[in-house]
UniProtKB/Swiss-Prot annotation:
The gene is betA. The active site is at residue 470. Coiled coil: none annotated. Pfam families: GMC_oxred_C, GMC_oxred_N. GO terms for biological process: glycine betaine biosynthetic process from choline. Pathway: Amine and polyamine biosynthesis; betaine biosynthesis via choline pathway; betaine aldehyde from choline (cytochrome c reductase route): step 1/1. This is Oxygen-dependent choline dehydrogenase. It is an enzyme of class 1 (oxidoreductase). Its EC number is 1.1.99.1, 1.2.1.8. It catalyses: choline + A = betaine aldehyde + AH2; betaine aldehyde + NAD(+) + H2O = glycine betaine + NADH + 2 H(+).
Amino acid sequence: MQQHYDYIIVGAGSAGCVLADRLSESGDHSVLLLEAGGSDKSIFIQMPTALSYPMNSEKYAWQFETDAEADLDGRRLHCPRGKVLGGSSSINGMVYVRGHACDFDEWEEQGAKGWNYQACLPYFRRAENWIDGEDEYRGGDGPLSTCAGNKMTLNPLYRAFIDAGKEAGYPETSDYNGYQQEGFGPMHMTVKNGVRASTSNAYLSRAKKRSNFKLIKGVVVQRILLEEKRAVGVEFELAGELRTCFAKNEVISSAGSIGSVQLLQLSGIGPKTVLEKAGVTPVHHLPGVGQNLQDHLEVYFQYHCQKPITLNGKLDWFSKGLIGAEWILTRKGLGATNHFESCAFIRSRAGLKWPNIQYHFLPAAMRYDGQAAFDGHGFQVHVGPNKPESRGRVEIVSANPSDKPKIQFNYLSTERDRQDWRDCIRLTREILAQPAMDEFRGEEIQPGINVATDAEIDQWVKENVESAYHPSCSCKMGADDDPMAVLDEECRVRGITNLRVVDSSVFPTIPNGNLNAPTIMVAERAADLILHKQPLPPQRSKVWLAPSWETQQRTGEPMR
């Protein structure tokens, strides 16, 4: 096995596959990519409708869980992370949401210089191949294919949800990834010709064809090799043997918001007290490693449907077989979508400059494991506040890489977070009570009409909320004078040369949306920084903000 490479990347996930492609693209640099998981060539990964299977599989995901969460009455929440080529982009719901422009301006305000929306937009566009073609906001010839699924044609509930939002006084948006995020409209997904567009399919497939690129699967990286606070390589276990490889230029951790923290701390980089408690000799005291952890929470807001038109009628094995057969033969139909084809982004209160609540609409009433919630037909929205104040941490518990780290999000630990949930439940109920839903809406399944007061909502949320699987921000970028900043504005680990982190852990704050799209964008921009390329020129495109955001929660008046 070759032992020396220009760049060593740990983790073939949403960011790592992008870096593998971009760093090897010129042919001038040798690149090694190490991945703990295996192949992504499974129908359960590649067929979009099968999304619940890989996420709950030991084969394809690290099945982490949180420590007992005090403000969720001691519940431990599921926290799966991808362990397969493509990482979490191979097990996620394929929803493509960049985030609001103001999220990235907020990053720069938090000390991540050069990461404002104007600087990030060109990299979102470079990554993307939008099915409707290039425009000022969307990319038309990038590796990552995005589309709108079946464009809401297979179920009238998608359009009814958008109409209900308009009747409730909210705007409609034709492209939440473009000029206007706020409002109700069609949802976008990472699917190409009916197949999941993971970063493995989009980026890694290109790198694999190059002689200067090497991929090793089934590898658990034990630690980063350091010499006098300089990263020189990695030590990893392969088929039961410890091996080493060395990096002439840089080591890059793209192991995710849990994995990158774990790797840095196992290597002696992190809060001194955490390292010593775990039995790891501190090499570099960096107190922010593992801190600032953030996530999105969500609930399933469910109703019976009065018409037999929902996906609940397709959950028997015979129907699943027909859907699978059509997909295998044509890559079309219900198998070719994640079923989230309409959505919304709204503000929960006046005075918010940009949305803090996100809706995914699903024409079915399901449980978290993908099974039916009840007998009969129903529909649901996945909903939750997306800009939490609560902050958590990730900490190793021993020097053994096989031991899962301690994960504590401190969910709902602030009064603002709890109030956002009360607002969220009440606003959702109001939206779904609009006339556009009358012909479909039956009895409210959950939360249920008996959940109405602050105390009732608080308790129901505690008992029913789940993670949206968006852990992030645990190795944040920040300014030189921020003692908790793990990275500088070029994703370089502070105090250690030739070492970067590039994944969702670098976010200073969690954006209003799913994480795959911004993670890919970060990797695209980081690749240019690593290669010392001139960054793409900033793009000064206009962004819609509600004209009366300072004084009004929405732009219109509800019909009901």
